[in-house]
Regions:
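Generic N-terminal targeting/processing segments that precede catalytic cores or assembly contacts
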Residues: 1-108, 130-132, 241, 248-290
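Glycine- and small hydrophobic-enriched segments that form the cores of compact globular domains
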Residues: 85, 112-119, 131, 135-136, ...
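Acidic-glycine-rich active-site phosphate/pyrophosphate-binding loop
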Residues: 87-104, 139-158, 202-211, 246, ...
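Conserved phosphate/anionic-ligand binding catalytic regions in large, soluble enzymes, centered on
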Residues: 107-125, 169-174
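Well-ordered alpha-helical segments within folded domains of soluble proteins
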Residues: 118-127, 175-180, 228-234
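Alpha-helical support elements that line or immediately flank enzyme active sites
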Residues: 123-134, 182-187
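Glycine- and acidic-residue-rich phosphate-binding/metal-coordinating active-site segment common to enzymes
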Residues: 144, 150-163, 167-177, 182
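Functionally critical mobile loop/hinge segments
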Residues: 184-290
Length: 290
C-alpha cells in the first residue's frame, strides 16, 4: 500500500520494475480482497463503457436542458476538414472528452473517472493514445490501472469532489491521472509520470466549480476538453525530462489547501462564478422557472 506519490514511485520501481499497473492490482487486493482476474474483468468493463461513451457522444442531439449537445460532432467535422491549428492527437482527445460529457448530460452511461462531471478526460486521453501509440488491450487496461493508482493518492490526500475542492479537484484530478498514465503508456518512468501530475495540478490550482443552473454541463463539458489537452502537454513536458521545482506530494497538498479555502459559492453550489452571471441566471430561469 502507498500513501503518497513518492511511495508509489518507490514501490513501483523497487518491487514491480516500474510497472504501476501491477502495483495497483496488488493494492486493490490489499484493499478489497479482489483477485487479479476479477480486477482485470472489472477494469475491462470500465474500458468498454468508456469507449462506448466516446462513440455515442458524437450524437448531435441536445441535452434535456438544451445547454449542451452537438459540440463533439462539430469538432469532429472540423478535424476532418484538415484545417485545424492544433495537433490531431490532442484535438481528437478534446473532441472525445466533449463527447463523453455530452453523453453524460443526456443521461448516457459513463465511467466516473474520478467523477461523472470529469468523466471525459481519461477516456478521451486513452482513446486518443490508443490511436497514436497503438496500445494493445493489455496496455489499455494498464493505462487505467495506473491512472487509478495515481488517482487514489489524490483522492486520499486532497479531493476529487467539486463540492469539497472546486473544479480543480474534479477536472484537475482527472487531467492529472490521465497525464500520468499517458507518460507510462509512452514508455516513461513512474517518476516522469509524477512530474506530469505536477504540471497539470499547478495549472489547475484554484479552478472553481460554478455549474450554470446547477447542472453538470456549462462550463463542465468544455473544461473536460481543456483537461484532456493539458494531459498531453504535461506528458510531453515530463517525457522531455522537465521536472517540477515543487515535489508532487506538496503540489497535491496545496490543491487540498486551496480547495478548502474556496468560498462555498465556488464549490458546486451554483452561487458564484459563471452560474451567477446575467446569462447564467437567465438560463437557469429558462430551465427551472422562477
Amino acid at each position: 500500500m502507498f500513501y503518497s506519490i513518492k511511495e508509489l514511485v518507490e514501490q513501483a520501481d523497487l518491487d514491480y520494475q516500474g510497472n504501476v499497473a501491477e502495483l495497483m492490482i496488488a493494492t486493490e487486493y490489499e484493499l478489497t480482497g479482489r483477485e487479479r482476474d476479477e480486477v482485470l474483468r472489472l477494469m475491462g468493463r470500465n474500458l468498454e463503457v468508456m469507449k462506448a461513451s466516446v462513440l455515442l457522444g458524437l450524437d448531435e442531439s441536445k441535452s434535456r436542458s438544451g445547454l449542451t449537445g452537438g459540440d463533439a460532432a462539430k469538432l469532429d467535422h472540423y478535424i476532418q476538414s484538415g484545417k485545424t491549428l492544433s495537433d490531431y492527437t490532442v484535438l481528437t482527445a478534446a473532441k472525445n472528452a466533449i463527447a463523453v460529457n455530452e453523453h453524460n448530460a443526456k443521461m448516457g452511461l459513463v465511467c466516473a473517472t474520478p467523477t461523472a462531471g470529469s468523466a471525459g478526460c481519461l477516456p478521451a486521453v486513452l482513446t486518443s493514445a490508443i490511436e497514436k501509440l497503438g496500445l494493445s488491450e493489455e496496455e489499455q487496461l494498464n493505462f487505467l490501472l495506473a491512472a487509478g493508482a495515481f488517482g487514489l493518492v489524490i483522492a486520499n490526500n486532497a479531493s476529487i469532489s467539486g463540492a469539497e475542492g472546486g473544479c480543480q479537484a474534479e477536472v484537475g484530478s482527472a487531467s492529472a491521472m490521465s497525464a500520468a498514465a499517458l507518460v507510462l503508456a509512452a514508455g516513461g518512468s513512474p517518476f516522469q509520470a509524477s512530474q506530469a501530475i505536477c504540471f497539470v495540478i499547478k495549472n489547475m490550482l484554484g479552478l472553481i466549480c460554478d455549474p450554470v443552473a446547477g447542472l453538470v454541463e456549462v462550463p463542465c463539458v468544455k473544461r473536460n476538453a481543456m483537461g484532456a489537452s493539458y494531459a498531453f502537454i504535461a506528458a510531453d513536458m515530463a517525457l522531455a525530462g522537465i521536472e517540477s521545482k515543487i515535489p508532487v506530494d506538496e503540489v497535491i497538498d496545496t490543491m487540498y489547501q486551496v480547495g478548502s479555502s474556496l468560498p462555498t459559492a465556488f464549490r458546486e453550489t451554483a452561487e458564484g462564478g459563471l452560474a451567477t452571471t446575467p446569462t447564467g441566471r437567465r438560463l437557469s430561469k429558462e430551465i427551472f422557472g422562477e
